[in-house]
Regions:
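Active-site substrate-recognition loop segments, prototypically the cytochrome P450 B′-helix/B-C loop
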Residues: 2-166, 175-193, 197-199, 478, ...
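Cytochrome P450 proximal C-terminal region
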Residues: 374-503
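Cytochrome P450 catalytic core segment centered on helix I
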Residues: 182, 191-241, 245
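Cytochrome P450 catalytic-core helices
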Residues: 248-255, 259-284, 364-384
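Cytochrome P450 heme-binding Cys-pocket and its upstream "meander" loop
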Residues: 295, 334-371
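A translation/RNA-centric and nucleic-acid-associated enzymatic feature enriched
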Residues: 306, 319-320, 325-339
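Conserved cytochrome P450 K-helix E-x-x-R motif and the immediately C-terminal K′/meander segment
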Residues: 284-319
Length: 503
């Protein structure tokens, strides 16, 4: 997902070169144009009215694609892997050398051993490793960890009476959680985020990719020597026997969810809770309203607005359109969801949205993503119940790229709240002292350890690698004050500020 953050798409250099044979006379809608950034839903609506469920568009660099804006057509594409491949080796224009060298998309949507870019048995093997490894995280333990992470972040601004919640909360919660779940030491995570930042903001995409991959390889080497109860160790020990390159690619994909899509989900739901009267009232902090707000966002304004490309492996007809083998087809999750609501308004009462995809390539971490978002929102509204938007909702600025949707900043005001004086231990619930760093058992058939009867598998979350550092002998407790805290957060805040502004 991170690879799809095309921060160069709004620059003049993203336009196709004059006379490019791949784009002459296509009449395609340029999704890199300012109009799309200002109001993407107006563009989706116009495309649907003019072309039906599939419409010709151009990505950055003039890359041609068909954009799917119809719900039923999108479902059919995602559920027909025998016809629609995710492997860029099937991309005809790429294979024929027709794509601009300046384009961001072909450089990142390249053949690579990542679960979102492969099909068939290779896809099943990689996805099985991801699902088995992420499935070992106990939801109760994860909930407790997110609550404590949220408390620590809220402590940093709760006494000020005002805050900007995207950079200081909505984006930091998932980043800290991902570092925790990876079992990633601070120094490695700092370098990893610097690499991802260079990739995302377009300053050095290839160099940033290398830096991030090198940091992950160092993490993998560390976990081979010192396995622990974390996703990295579980992926390494999985019976699928992933290569180091495959391990790097799967971790990059998971990291993309935390640094990219999750801030948009949390931020957009919080915007609704603060500005939409349907979500106001005395029970504002209640879990039902939070869940309703998340459903609203996932249906009407999903954080991943458009997803990566599909390629028909043979000529085919779908949605009233003839596609040639190797055509690039991009599914607009935002447009297809709204198409479904136009046809059947009652759908919004269920979770049949496509915000997490569908079919064999549906997001494997959707349940954890939703849990992190809901807990982060509940905790914030519980700690600061009188949050109010500082300014008019019409003044909020939005990301203007093709793939990711969300507000750039979310300024709020509130009555100052005194932060609790007690420290919070980071030992996960249900884990006895000394058990936290036990490695996974490599001999289990499906890569999982047996859990006691009545308990969830592996109810452990690794120690907080990216927490605010604690002094020696503190027992892993938070230290929310002092110079170390400022140093700890500087890299994360710098990274997040950098990529948000680049959008």
């Amino acid at each position: 997902v991170t690879q799809l953050y095309d921060s160069s798409a709004q620059r003049p250099g993203a336009l196709p070169p004059p006379g490019c044979p791949a784009h002459a006379g296509t009449g395609a809608e340029p999704l890199h144009a300012p109009e799309f950034g200002r109001d993407p839903f107006a563009v989706y609506r116009r495309l649907r009215e003019a072309h039906g469920p599939l419409a010709p568009v151009e990505l950055d660099g003039g890359v041609p694609a068909m954009l799917c804006v119809g719900y039923e057509t999108a479902l059919e594409i995602m559920r027909r892997p025998e016809t629609f491949s995710k492997d860029p080796r099937n991309w005809r224009d790429r294979n024929e050398g027709l794509l601009s060298e300046s384009s961001f998309a072909p450089r990142v949507l390249r053949p690579r051993p990542q679960v979102d870019f492969v099909d068939g048995e290779e896809h099943r093997r990689l996805r099985g490793a991801i699902e088995d490894s992420t499935g070992r995280i106990d939801p109760g333990a994860l909930r407790t960890y997110v609550e404590r992470t949220a408390d620590t972040l809220i402590d940093q601004f709760c006494e000020a009476g005002e805050a900007e919640l995207i950079g200081s909360y909505c984006a930091l919660v998932p980043v800290l959680v991902m570092g925790q779940l990876f079992g990633c030491p601070q120094e490695i995570m700092d370098r990893l985020l610097r690499g991802v930042a260079a990739f995302i903001d377009g300053s050095d995409p290839l160099g940033g990719d290398r830096v991030a991959a090198e940091a992950l390889r160092e993490l993998i080497d560390l976990k081979r020597r010192e396995p622990a109860a974390d996703i990295t160790s579980w992926l390494i020990a999985h019976p699928a026997r992933l290569t180091d390159e495959e391990l790097v690619e799967q971790l990059l994909l998971l990291l993309g969810m935390g640094t990219g899509v999750m801030p948009g989900l949390i931020g957009s739901a919080l915007r609704l809770l603060l500005t939409d009267e349907r979500f106001s009232g005395d029970v504002m902090g209640g879990s039902m309203l939070v869940e309703d707000a998340l459903d609203e966002v996932l249906w009407t304004d999903p954080p991943l607005a458009n997803m990566g490309l599909y390629f028909p492996v043979h000529d085919t007809n779908i949605g009233g359109t003839r596609l040639r083998a190797g055509d690039a087809v991009m599914i607009s999750l935002a447009a297809t969801n709204r198409d479904a609501l136009l046809r059947s308004p009652h759908k919004q009462g269920n979770r049949a949205h496509l915000a997490f995809g569908a079919g064999p390539h549906a997001c494997p971490g959707r349940s954890s993503a939703r849990l992190i978002a809901s807990v982060a929102l509940e905790k914030l509204l519980d700690r600061i119940p009188d949050l109010a938007l500082a300014g008019e909702v019409e003044q909020l600025k939005w990301l203007s790229g093709v793939f990711v949707r969300g507000v750039i900043t979310l300024p709020v005001r509130f009555a100052p709240v005194i932060k609790p004086g007690s420290r919070r231990t980071m030992v996960p619930p249900g884990v006895r002292p000394g058990e936290r760093d036990q490695p996974p058992h490599p001999d289990q058939r499906d890569g999982r350890q047996d859990a006691p009867q009545g308990a969830s598998p592996l109810p452990s979350v690794p120690s907080l690698s990216l927490s605010l550092p604690a002094p020696p002998g503190s027992g892993g407790e938070f230290q929310p004050e002092g110079e170390d805290r400022q140093k700890q957060q500087s890299a994360l805040l710098g990274f997040l500020t950098r990529w948000r502004r680049s959008r």
